[in-house]
């Protein structure tokens, strides 16, 4: 028993060392987004709607970057574990190139079709005008955004989580300063309104991408650019990244019919859902996603070292730590939900609904504590299909299916929605546990590593 306790303490120290910079990075990203929303809300309702609609399309390059980032962290952590520096450098080189190439079409689409894309969603003329301008600028930054995400994840795979935090922090501070100054026209800056918010995003993403590329090109960090000539790496990057992209898009697309379902119960119920979700994300996302990233790093590196049994033990220990932390967060969020909601709305009906939604989400924090380390372990091994299946099952069968049947068909109203939300996240855990227990994720990772090793030896 004492040995188990010491083992958990040892892995907990490693998790904290790797995880706190990731948590800070996530907090800064959330803060940047919150500032954008607050500044935009000072313009007009049309501006808020314009940014909201444009962000629906901006999810696509974001998901591409996150997908390639998952591929990068899996391969770079595995190659770090086996000491294959050249192969690891080829991973980041090819991931950055693929990311930049994937982002270029969005620049063209933004220049030509930005207004049409906003109009396609049925927006009014002023919303189309503002949303088109904002989307054009955001899409212009797509290659840079993707490169920044890939660069951060690649470095994290080596075990360096502080440098991405610093670079991302610099970019976010620049973004926030420009958003406030150019958006509101304070200090000596011109008042550009919504264009200023877009320019802040563009400049911030540009700085982030240039800092990562400059770091890799200088060879001063753990990663550097190598001649991109490995077809095996390209194939593995795409095979790992693809399901993660689909995972993110399935969740984003499911939000459209789910919001339509919520609107049946009134604007207040819909607004309350978004308030509860925003509070939940602000409080839990930095922590849960940190556990996912850290588990990916440890899993990939340990598999690269050729210690598959140690991987399973580490995952179990991180699972216990994550579940304990998020359970405590769940309890805290449940207790303080009412005062938190009061910061977002003064309407009594909206506040009443929002408190309930926040408490429902707080219960889901327990599922997040279980799911994210399991998903991180699978992703670190290169298995992104199982987390994709988990999310797809959750959003289609539970988030949409269960919610609709219980709330509309059986007439339970919002109670059916609450059950649908909780069951969604429980289903994620169910599928992830099956994947960890019965899937061949360790064997598949060893096969991927072996193929990269053979290719290196043949050259």
Functional labels for PLM-detected ranges:
Residues 1-19, 76-141, 191-241, 299-364, ...:
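Short alpha-helical transmembrane segments in multi-pass integral membrane proteins
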Residues 23, 27, 60, 64, ...:
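Residue-level signature of the transmembrane alpha-helical core
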Residues 31-34, 42-45, 79-82, 157-158, ...:
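Helix-loop interface residues and adjacent transmembrane-helix termini in multi-pass membrane transporters
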Residues 35, 39-59, 125-130, 194-195, ...:
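Interfacial/gating helices of multi-pass transporter permease domains
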Residues 99, 153-181, 195, 202, ...:
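Alpha-helical transmembrane segments of multi-pass membrane transporters/permeases
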Residues 123-134, 138, 142-170:
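Cytoplasmic helix-loop-helix junction between adjacent transmembrane helices
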């Amino acid at each position: 028993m004492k040995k188990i306790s010491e083992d958990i303490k040892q892995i907990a120290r490693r998790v904290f060392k790797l995880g706190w910079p990731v948590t800070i990075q996530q907090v800064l990203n959330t803060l940047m987004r919150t500032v954008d929303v607050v500044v935009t809300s000072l313009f007009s309702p049309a501006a808020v709607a314009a940014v909201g609609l444009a962000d629906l399309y901006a999810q696509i390059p974001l998901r591409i970057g996150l997908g390639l980032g998952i591929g990068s962290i899996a391969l770079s952590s595995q190659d770090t574990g086996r000491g294959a520096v050249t192969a690891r450098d080829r991973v980041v080189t090819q991931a950055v190139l693929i990311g930049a190439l994937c982002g270029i079409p969005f620049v063209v689409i933004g220049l030509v079709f930005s207004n049409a894309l906003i109009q396609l969603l049925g927006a009014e003329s002023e919303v189309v005008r503002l949303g088109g301008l904002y989307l054009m600028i955001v899409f212009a930054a797509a290659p840079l955004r993707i490169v920044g995400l890939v660069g951060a994840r690649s470095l994290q795979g080596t075990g360096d989580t502080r440098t991405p935090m610093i670079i991302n922090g610099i970019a976010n501070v620049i973004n926030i300063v420009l958003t406030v100054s150019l958006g509101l026209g304070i200090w000596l800056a011109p008042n550009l309104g919504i264009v200023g918010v877009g320019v802040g995003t563009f400049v911030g993403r540009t700085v982030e991408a240039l800092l990562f590329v400059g770091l890799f090109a200088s060879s001063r960090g753990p990663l550097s650019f190598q001649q991109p000539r490995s077809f095996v790496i390209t194939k593995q990057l795409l095979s790992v990244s693809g399901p993660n992209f689909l995972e993110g898009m399935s969740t984003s697309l499911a939000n459209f019919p789910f919001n339509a379902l919520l609107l049946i119960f009134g604007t207040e119920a819909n607004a309350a859902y978004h308030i509860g979700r925003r509070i939940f994300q602000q409080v839990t996302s930095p922590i849960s996603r940190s556990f996912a990233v850290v588990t990916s790093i440890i899993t990939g590196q340990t598999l690269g070292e050729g210690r598959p049994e140690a991987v399973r033990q580490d995952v179990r220990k991180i699972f216990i730590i994550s579940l304990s932390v998020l359970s405590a967060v769940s309890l805290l969020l449940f207790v303080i939900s009412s005062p938190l909601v009061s910061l977002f709305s003064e309407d009594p009906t909206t506040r009443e609904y929002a408190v309930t939604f926040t408490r429902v989400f707080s219960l889901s924090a327990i599922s997040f504590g279980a799911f994210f380390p399991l998903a991180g372990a699978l992703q670190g091994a290169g298995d992104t299909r199982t987390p994709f299946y988990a999310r797809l099952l959750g959003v289609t069968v539970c988030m949409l299916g269960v919610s609709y049947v219980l709330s509309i068909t059986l007439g339970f109203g919002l109670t059916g929605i609450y059950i649908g939300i909780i069951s969604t996240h429980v289903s994620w855990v169910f599928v992830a546990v099956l994947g960890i227990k019965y899937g061949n994720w360790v064997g598949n990772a060893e096969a991927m590593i072996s193929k990269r090793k053979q290719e290196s030896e043949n050259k």
